Amino acid sequence: MTRGIHGRWVRFAAIAALSMMLAPAAGRADVPAPYPGTKTIETSKPYGALVQSLAAAIKANKMGLVSKASATVGAKSIGKTIPGNMVLMVFRPDFAIRMLKASVPAGIEAPIRFYITENPATGNASLTYRTPSSVFNPYRNAELDAMAAELDVIFAKIASDAVK
């Protein structure tokens, strides 16, 4: 009888442990802004127009468009179609030098990204980015914080100009 109770207890404990491990995964939902400092601007601009206006705003605000990556372009290359989706990576050499002088490990954060997504239901696009201060905050470095505060103003202006 002791063995029977013990066996049931072990099975119960195993099932309970498994349930607790699986419960968070089953209850998870997509979090649109999982990081602090994430800004999303819904626009009435079509995807292509927002891509163009963001590139122009980056240039007008004297920042560099370091690179672009597009899942939409990648999907098209294999014969698939998905809603507009592009990341534009932005920085500038003088900020890179200051960043690396303050913290070499922080170099992984640059360039800072703008993310454009198309709403297939409306055809309108959204612009999302993380404020530079939130990107660099985890490094707890006064020089990075000062630089990030300058970049916050520039990135907010780029976003504002792009969505006009």
Predicted regions and their residues:
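C-terminal partner/receptor-binding element of secreted or periplasmic proteins
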Residues: 131-164
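Bacterial N-terminal signal peptides that target proteins for export
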Residues: 2-14
